[in-house]
Amino acid sequence: MTAHKLTPILNVSNLAESFRWFEKLGWEKGWDWGEPPTFGGVCSGHCEIFLCEGAQGGRGHGGVKGTFGPDGDETSDKGAWMSIWVDDVDAVHRRCVEQGLEVAWPPTDMPWGVREMHVRHPDGHVFRISRAIG
């Protein structure tokens, strides 16, 4: 098998609110489907994420402990985790703080050669915002 593209599908509790959350992160609403809409997609560059209200997968609870570090609990959140590779992790962090998004882990140079931060969607999905360093 040769894969040509991978598009994750996230279970969300409110499609309209999720579109607004992704817009704060700097993504754009690509499309929606249904009346009222219960399925849609957000886009950034060549990347797309599908959002499905109340179906297709599970979601976490949001507002839980940090994702890494001595007080972190990677298993406390049952939402999906995804890595998004960017040019400037610190610029994304500034945008998240300015927009009031929940930063679960601040920008940190990790021992595996990546600078990354974590931002949590209200439904508990965690996005690892990363770039290679070194």
PLM region spans:
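Alpha-helical macromolecular-interaction surfaces
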Residues: 16-20, 91
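Short, surface-exposed ligand-recognition loops at beta-strand->loop->(often short) alpha-helix junctions
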Residues: 11-13
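Vicinal oxygen chelate
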Residues: 1-9, 24-120, 130-134
